[in-house]
Amino acid sequence: MQPLQSAGYDRAITVFSPDGRLFQVEYAREAVKRGTTSLGVKSKEGIVLVVDKRPTSKLVEPKSIEKIFQIDEHIGAATSGLVADARAIIEKARLEAQINRITYNEPIRVESLAKKICDMKQMYTQHGGVRPFGTALIIGGVNGRGCRLFETDPSGALIEYKATAIGAGRPAAMEEFEKKYSDDMNLNQAIELALDAVYEATEGKTTPESVEIAVIEAADKKYRRLPDDEIRDHVEELLIRKEKEEEE
């Protein structure tokens, strides 16, 4: 990408630069790139969401850091970027999910919710007096059309993925996904792959306390956050596996 040389075109959100760029949107993307790494993986048995939530200080309570959110009983989201912006979008998403249940007496489809979130993000790139949301979301869930995984960025763009990552560790994580992803993975293999990607994205600084994992299984279409003991087991398996790889 070209250097962000604004020449004054970043003073208003609604003004394009001569080469067709909205600098405030690009600045919002930079906020996401500086955020902690979040990942999503789709398998034949469900969706896996994993985030790196290493505290910035030893005085921070790890449990107070929240980067994965339940939106509805069958949908979850992982975020990167400005936490307060992400929280505002999550609250809006939860409201849309409940409105759909009340109006149509059925759970909202994953793609419909993702599009509604992107519509809101796009509106904040088009009006004066507001700024773009400095956060990206990975939205995963299971509905009648199977397992779905979407990524939204600050511009309101929406892309569906088999596996994706956002945040500072995205390049390393995506490289790991490109090498190891398979359509035939079960849920445990998807968790293994996601943790491999987090390990690469954090340069090996992965511990049981530094990651958070949530799954939405295709069998029951229910969001579930993994308890600490399950996360510890998965991370210990990861570290043993990496030790063996280094020895070889």
From Swiss-Prot:
<dbReference type="GO" id="GO:0006511">
    <property type="term" value="P:ubiquitin-dependent protein catabolic process"/>
</dbReference>
<comment type="subunit">
    <text>The 20S proteasome core is composed of 14 alpha and 14 beta subunits that assemble into four stacked heptameric rings, resulting in a barrel-shaped structure. The two inner rings, each composed of seven catalytic beta subunits, are sandwiched by two outer rings, each composed of seven alpha subunits. The catalytic chamber with the active sites is on the inside of the barrel. Has a gated structure, the ends of the cylinder being occluded by the N-termini of the alpha-subunits. Is capped at one or both ends by the proteasome regulatory ATPase, PAN.</text>
</comment>
<dbReference type="Pfam" id="PF10584">
    <property type="entry name" value="Proteasome_A_N"/>
</dbReference>
<dbReference type="Pfam" id="PF00227">
    <property type="entry name" value="Proteasome"/>
</dbReference>
<dbReference type="InterPro" id="IPR000426">
    <property type="entry name" value="Proteasome_asu_N"/>
</dbReference>
<dbReference type="InterPro" id="IPR019982">
    <property type="entry name" value="Proteasome_asu_arc"/>
</dbReference>
<dbReference type="InterPro" id="IPR001353">
    <property type="entry name" value="Proteasome_sua/b"/>
</dbReference>
<comment type="similarity">
    <text>Belongs to the peptidase T1A family.</text>
</comment>
<dbReference type="InterPro" id="IPR029055">
    <property type="entry name" value="Ntn_hydrolases_N"/>
</dbReference>
<dbReference type="GO" id="GO:0010498">
    <property type="term" value="P:proteasomal protein catabolic process"/>
</dbReference>
<dbReference type="GO" id="GO:0019773">
    <property type="term" value="C:proteasome core complex, alpha-subunit complex"/>
</dbReference>
<keyword id="KW-0647">Proteasome</keyword>
<dbReference type="GO" id="GO:0004298">
    <property type="term" value="F:threonine-type endopeptidase activity"/>
</dbReference>
<comment type="function">
    <text>Component of the proteasome core, a large protease complex with broad specificity involved in protein degradation.</text>
</comment>
<dbReference type="InterPro" id="IPR050115">
    <property type="entry name" value="Proteasome_alpha"/>
</dbReference>
<dbReference type="InterPro" id="IPR023332">
    <property type="entry name" value="Proteasome_alpha-type"/>
</dbReference>
<dbReference type="GO" id="GO:0005737">
    <property type="term" value="C:cytoplasm"/>
</dbReference>
<protein>
    <recommendedName>
        <fullName>Proteasome subunit alpha</fullName>
    </recommendedName>
</protein>
<keyword id="KW-0963">Cytoplasm</keyword>
